[in-house]
Amino acid sequence: MTADMVWRDVKKRFKAFLGKGRGAAIAPQMNQVEKASSVITDRMIIDRFTSDADNTFLVSFPRTGSHWLRMLMELYFERPSLVRIFYYPNRQDYLTLHSHDLDLKIERRNVIYLYRTPVDTIFSQLYYHKEPVSSRQRIEHWTELYGRHLDKWLCKEAFTGKKTIVTYEGMRQDLVAEFARVAGHFERPLDRRRLDAVAGKISKDEVKRKTGHDPQVVQLEESYVDIRSRFRAEHERFVWDVLTRGRPYLGDYFETETFERK
């Protein structure tokens, strides 16, 4: 993936910032640690990170838990990631660059890939975009995109030299074991006490506070859970049928509670 491709992705995702003349949002202009998050839109900074093939990219389909993981990583390693920074705006030793890779053009040697069970991912995506959660057409649209994403990053890519796979469900069930993979990716032993302290800070309310730029990131209303339960009951089979259509092997990467890593 070239620096130009990364820059186009940044411009697309953070058009509002660039449109307000914040294209050089370097550290002195950012919020402090305990305030809301900030965005780096300085192309020189992004190009410098991207030009080093050994730097880590964090790749995830939308609505798979990347905000939570990035906040954990930033506090645990005390290093920010590009391009949104949550806690350490005055540091420039960036740990990763996050991308959703929706156009499936990213090819990097060093990658952490985060994924989540497809039914909940698709529901969350529909809800985020305020699309009708009962529309089979929209369900199929997002499921097909996610299926291609999973197929690329779990099965078909042949360009990574170092790839660590992390799951949202694994983080929820056993954060210590799952985050140990992340620590290992950066050749660091897991510090259990440090992780416990960091995880204790990052509640859903904290993620909500740090993502005030986008109120749709975290849903706290009680009705959300009920609507999701109905979606699961009515559309789970359809989501799996679309996901595995032409890709039957994708089912091997999921279990009822935790996921296999091939």
Regions found by a protein language model. Name each.
Residues 1-56, 126, 188-262:
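PAPS-dependent sulfotransferases, especially Golgi type II membrane carbohydrate sulfotransferases
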Residues 52-54, 92, 107-108, 159:
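Residue-level preference for short coil/turn positions at secondary-structure junctions
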Residues 59-60:
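The Walker A (P-loop) glycine that initiates the GxxxxGKT/S ATP-binding motif of P-loop NTPases
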Residues 64:
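ATP-binding Walker
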Residues 67-78:
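A conserved segment at the C-terminal end of the G1
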Residues 80-104:
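Cysteine-dependent PTP/DSP-like catalytic domain, specifically the C-terminal lobe
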Residues 100-227, 237:
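PAPS-dependent sulfotransferase catalytic domain
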